[in-house]
């Protein structure tokens, strides 16, 4: 009897073990970390050098180094800061790719475009979009492919991220009642103007460009991804069923739906997960993801973009004192952050310093803490505000990402079984640990939620 009982127990244990072995394993969620090298040349607390970047790599599966660009006339892929990137200067390209020796599981990609390839010449605004001009030129596409391949191979990158600078949607106000009638993506029109009269041609040409890059990369097993920049209409420029064949993954810029630059008179949630009432139904993470899924992009290739910063507006005496968005009668004149040094954007440590803490609890006026408003439903995100005083001064309203809301988006990625999260940008996370003495808190929160 004892032997028989032991045999039964053994069979049960074997059956349990077999069921574990045969159980389907969910694919690993990826974390793509962007590093804008422009932060390397900043002065002050916003300067992120490689030694301070390195601790982040234990949490990243991919590091995307930004940004390269293209020459207008030659269509060559080039460094946007040769003194910083190339061997003749500080040699940051090689410094970054050599990090693979210490972190062999991290793949390091070079990104092209990213809304950072800005021509400063006073006549540049009158010139055509050089990214569209390149697409229209077969010779230009070939030259780009050859030169970008050379950059990637010469400096030891594992692949390329194509953050193509397509024309952006024009800001469009959606008034009460209109939001429910506004269906799908606009195929040609955005707002009251045509974004690109030749969008169908450019869509085909962009597909051809990605195909050619992938063909050049394939013998070396180099990676190829694309970043859909914020407020670029995917239906205009991405032939999704075609391009996914050439891409290892897609990073969606699912943030900056509202910014002070685009919406100087109305403050609202910059990156909600789900649709809000009486808003444009496409201005949220879920709508962007669903569009790519509906067009046959594998869920495993989609990475949801999460920002590490906030978008601030200045409140006026006409903005009211409730802070409830959308907030009208605002201005795009919030004070510039001392760390970021960029109008209309606050890094997470800059936002954190504005929230109630022991250093500002009793301060008044321009130094008084903001009132933080969280979203218990975890659908839209957090905001904070300080109403303007009787003189119309010191008012501010910020929509921002923090460790909690970033983790909520990682949770959304897990629920929808997507590929992972793309973090924009390491330089705006609290890489110095100024807020809570923990470095990279947003990055850590995302990684924890993706893996637990």
Curated annotation (Swiss-Prot):
Pfam families: Glyco_hydro_18 (PF00704). One of its GO terms (biological process) is regulation of chitin metabolic process. Residues 1-18 form the signal peptide. Glycans are attached at residue 233. Coiled coil: none annotated. Residues 29-452 form the GH18 domain. In larvae, it is expressed in the fat body and by hemocytes. InterPro entries: Chitinase_II/V-like_cat (IPR011583), Chitinase_insertion_sf (IPR029070), Glyco_hydro18_cat (IPR001223), Glycoside_hydrolase_SF (IPR017853), Glycosyl_Hydrlase_18 (IPR050314), IDGF (IPR015520). One of its GO terms (molecular function) is chitin binding. Changing residue 266 to I: In strain: ZBMEL131, ZBMEL157, ZBMEL186 and ZBMEL191. Probably required to stimulate the proliferation, polarization and motility of imaginal disk cells. May act by stabilizing the binding of insulin-like peptides to its receptor through a simultaneous interaction with both molecules to form a multiprotein signaling complex. This is Imaginal disk growth factor 6. The gene is Idgf6.
């Amino acid at each position: 009897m004892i032997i028989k009982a032991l045999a039964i127990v053994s069979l049960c244990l074997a059956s349990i073990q077999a069921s574990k072995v045969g159980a389907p394993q969910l694919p690993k969620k990826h974390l793509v970390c962007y590093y804008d090298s422009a932060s390397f040349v900043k002065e002050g607390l916003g300067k992120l050098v490689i030694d301070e970047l390195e601790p982040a790599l234990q949490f990243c599966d991919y590091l995307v180094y930004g940004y390269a660009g293209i020459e207008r006339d030659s269509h060559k892929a080039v460094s946007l800061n040769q003194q910083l990137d190339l061997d003749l200067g500080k040699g940051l390209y090689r410094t970054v790719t050599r990090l693979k020796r210490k972190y062999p599981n991290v793949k390091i990609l070079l990104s092209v475009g990213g809304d950072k390839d800005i021509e400063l010449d006073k006549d540049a605004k009158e010139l055509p979009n050089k990214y569209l001009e390149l697409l229209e030129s077969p010779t230009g596409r070939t030259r780009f492919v050859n030169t970008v391949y050379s950059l990637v191979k010469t400096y030891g990158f594992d692949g390329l991220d194509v953050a193509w600078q397509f024309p952006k949607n024009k800001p469009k106000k959606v008034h009460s009642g209109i939001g429910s009638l506004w269906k799908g993506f606009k195929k040609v029109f955005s707002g009251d103007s045509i974004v690109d009269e030749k969008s169908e041609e450019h869509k085909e040409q962009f597909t051809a460009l990605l195909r050619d890059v992938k063909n050049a990369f394939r013998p070396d097993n180099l990676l190829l991804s694309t970043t859909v920049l914020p407020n670029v209409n995917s239906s205009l420029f991405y032939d999704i069923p075609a391009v996914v064949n050439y891409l290892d993954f897609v990073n969606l810029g699912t943030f900056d739906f509202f910014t002070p630059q685009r919406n100087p008179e109305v403050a609202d949630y910059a990156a909600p997960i789900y649709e809000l009432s009486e808003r444009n139904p496409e201005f949220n993470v879920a709508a962007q993801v669903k569009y790519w899924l509906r067009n046959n992009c594998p869920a495993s290739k989609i990475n949801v973009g999460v920002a590490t910063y906030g978008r601030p507006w200045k409140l006026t005496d006409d903005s009211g004192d409730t802070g409830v968005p959308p907030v009208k009668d605002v201005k795009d004149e919030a004070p510039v952050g001392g760390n970021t040094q960029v109008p209309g954007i606050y890094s997470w440590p800059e936002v954190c310093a504005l929230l109630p803490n022991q250093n500002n609890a009793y301060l008044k006026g321009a130094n008084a803490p903001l009132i933080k408003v969280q979203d218990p439903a975890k659908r839209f995100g957090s905001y904070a505000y300080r109403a303007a005083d009787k003189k119309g001064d010191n008012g501010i309203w910020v929509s921002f990402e923090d460790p909690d809301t970033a983790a909520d988006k990682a949770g959304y990625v897990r629920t929808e079984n997507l590929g992972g999260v793309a973090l924009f940008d390491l330089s705006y996370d609290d890489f110095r640990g100024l807020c809570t003495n923990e470095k990279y808190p947003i990055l850590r929160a995302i990684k924890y939620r993706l893996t637990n």
